[in-house]
Swiss-Prot record:
Probable substrate-specific adapter of CUL3-containing E3 ubiquitin-protein ligases which mediate the ubiquitination and subsequent proteasomal degradation of host target proteins. GO terms for cellular component: host cell cytoplasm. The lineage of its organism: Viruses, Varidnaviria, Bamfordvirae, Nucleocytoviricota, Pokkesviricetes. Residues 20-89 form the BTB domain. The BTB domain is responsible for the interaction with CUL3 while the Kelch repeat domains supposely serve to recruit the cellular substrates. It is found in: Host cytoplasm. This is Kelch repeat and BTB domain-containing protein 2. PANTHER family: KELCH-LIKE PROTEIN 32, LD33804P. The keyword DNA damage does not apply. The keyword Repeat applies. It comes from the Viruses.
Amino acid sequence: MDIKNDIRNISNLLDDDILCDVIITIGDGEEIKAHKTILAAGSTYFKTMFTTPMIARDLVTRVNLQMFDKDVVKNIVQYLYNRHISSMNVIDVLKCADYLLINDLVTNCESYIKDYINHDIYHKLYEMVHIPIVKYIKRMLISNIPTLITTNAFKKTVFEILFDIISTNDSVYLYREGYKVTILLKWLEYNYITEEQLLCILSCIDIQNLDKKSRLLLYSNKTINMHPSCIQFLLDNKQNRNIIPHQLCLACHDTNYNVCNPCIVVYNINTMEYSVISTIPNHIINYASAIVDNDIIIARGYNFNNPSLNKVYKINIENKIHVELPPIIKNRCRFSLAVIDDTIYAIGGQNGTNVERTIECYTMGDDKWKMLPNMPIALSSYGMCVLDQYIYIIGGRTQHIDYTSVHTVNSIDMEEDTNISNKVMRYDTVNNIWETLPNFWTGTINPGVVSHKDDIYVVCDIKDEKNVKTCIFRYNTNTYNGWELVTTTESRLSALHTILYNNTIMMLHCYESYMLQDTFNVYTREWNHMCHQHSNSYIMYNILPIY
């Protein structure tokens, strides 16, 4: 049986106007003669129409499709005869195919869009609320907002789409309040908005729980200040809680056992008390971790039974529920996770006997990770922090080191630390490029790195001829004047876990059964040392601010 020949014969019926019993009126009053049986075989719309008793009695049926581009209709009718369609605007084809309920053509268009879609047509597809692809497009649009807001397409986004993005309460698409402000203010740069519309948008933002920077940007916006009702709304929703973190998440290893037994501890900074809230799956070490909203993300690492674990877990801090997320593409340990808005970045690290240059990212709600441009050099055990759209990387190891036991995983041996980098670079998450910054004073591994306003602070141990000092360096991201030594103190000779809160750099050390807490105020430049003994013995592996 020659299928190609049969299709050719059917197509000839259309070309020769033989036995036609339907006339389709298209743009400019032009007419296409076709056959009911063939149209009904490929289109549910035509099948339903032609089997309606009143129309079924007609010898010749007329159909009006002047609402669509005439060339698109011609191509789609041709498709129903020979299953082939010429290269055309996929959006126009999709609109018409969806209207005519040609399911296989709609599916083909959806597949094409998923493979080749770009930011310039996101907003056009988003407005096609009646077609199945829209749900996918909405997810793609929202998950790519960090890039989309830098494009011309975002400038043309209509208010209804902006409102849909900011007002969504779907956990897959949910944004932090501060990032909602970023999206809104960027859109306001290019678009007119009525007072009623603006008030409607502001009501979708939790003003009381905004970070200080976002609140200042919102309060100082010229468009918002033009509307009295919007100003009053902001005043009526003053911040009513202290956003300074007072509890931390500590990922620990219980030293009562000779095997890895990691657990998660919530530690209160003010009372220096802690409580175990969960265990970590698979008894892994040298994993990376991060906080996204109220969830702890645990990624990769290894254990001694399986050095190639690729699992990623999300652990809710309140209900303790563990959920497995899509696995990271590259095997990694001794790396870090950076979080910007709802996107997690996994950078470098050690992969077997190799050190990685690769970076990949995952947006909460997606079904997989995706690769991004490589780092300039391969690094593991580096220091990292986030400031605005940038991920800063300081120091790190350039060569592989053997796997170590949990008891020494965080120890620092200054004599054995060779092949250590003094490079400083940052990754621009909007433009997807790496930039090189002034080198650090010396090579360093696992330095504590925090950001404060426009400054990057690095806390690390540096050995001189006599002893080891804990040093704090500062780099201003506006002046680019290089690194300034801010202060030094006697080293505790232990791994440093560093965070910043209330204008204070805090370093936690764990030694035997003691929790050591050192703080340095970036304004007064005063040190404060505290020591607290706890009942059990833990090796603290990582530290993350919760609230």
